[in-house]
């Protein structure tokens, strides 16, 4: 499975130079995206847990390109609504919804059809059963991601690797949290400033 995923990403990266780029993110423009992602818990007591989620993103490009050298880029503020968030645990599967109102993305200004970015964010997660088991149905999420936008003529495809921590922040005892590594795929567009 791992090898197939690596081959898929390699082929995707090879196809990028042939893509006709759309206009990328610009100051005052917007990002609209639908995405899905999933992964597993990292080492520790919750390492057997798996997650899968689907979300919608609205982003606002806040700045024109600035910054030194290879970090020259734009800042984006983003909000994700997550209508599907599954946590597969040892004894059950938790079904949840979330909202991530704190997303900050730095998209590098490459002037090419591939736009690397990194991102941090946070939000809430509400589930029908306790996550992790025996803790709380209300949790908070914090995350960091590294990704690539592949700009096409009208739309873009995004791929990223995301670290996410899920925790009740002390609302219940115990508070073991779940640390996950996820792979995310998005389909969206950047609207231009009018």
Residue ranges, per PLM feature:
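Cleavable N-terminal export/targeting peptides
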Residues: 1-26, 192-194
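Residues that define the transmembrane beta-barrel architecture of outer-membrane proteins
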Residues: 28-30, 48-54, 93-100, 114, ...
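Short loop/turn motifs that connect adjacent beta-strands in outer-membrane beta-barrel proteins
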Residues: 20-29, 63-75, 109-115, 151-157, ...
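Residues on the lipid-exposed face of transmembrane beta-strands in outer-membrane beta-barrel proteins
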Residues: 34, 38, 54-60, 102-108, ...
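Gram-negative (and chloroplast) outer-membrane scaffold detector with strong preference
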Residues: 54-128
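Transmembrane beta-strand segments that form the barrel wall of outer-membrane beta-barrel proteins
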Residues: 32-42, 78-85, 120-126, 160-165
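Short glycine/proline- and aromatic-enriched beta-strand/turn motifs that initiate or cap beta-hairpins
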Residues: 20-63, 175, 180-194
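Extracellular loop and loop/strand-boundary signature of outer-membrane beta-barrel proteins
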Residues: 42-44, 89-91, 128-134, 169-175
């Amino acid at each position: 499975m791992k090898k197939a995923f690596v081959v898929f990403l390699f082929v995707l990266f090879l196809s990028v130079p042939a893509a006709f780029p759309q206009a990328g993110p610009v100051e005052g423009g917007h990002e609209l995206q639908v995405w899905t992602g999933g992964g597993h818990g990292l080492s520790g007591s919750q390492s057997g847990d798996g997650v899968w989620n689907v979300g919608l993103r609205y982003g606002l490009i806040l700045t024109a390109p600035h910054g030194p050298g290879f970090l020259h880029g734009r800042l984006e503020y983003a909000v994700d609504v997550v209508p599907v968030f599954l946590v597969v645990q040892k004894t059950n599967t938790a079904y949840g919804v979330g909202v991530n109102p704190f997303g900050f993305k730095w998209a590098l200004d490459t002037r090419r059809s591939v736009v690397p970015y990194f991102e941090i964010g946070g939000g809430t997660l509400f589930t029908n059963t306790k996550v992790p088991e025996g803790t709380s149905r209300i949790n908070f999420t914090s995350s960091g991601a590294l990704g690539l936008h592949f700009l096409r003529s009208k739309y873009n495809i995004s791929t990223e690797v995301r670290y996410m921590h899920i925790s009740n922040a002390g609302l219940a005892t115990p508070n073991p949290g779940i640390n996950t590594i996820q792979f995310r795929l998005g389909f969206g567009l950047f609207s231009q400033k009018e």
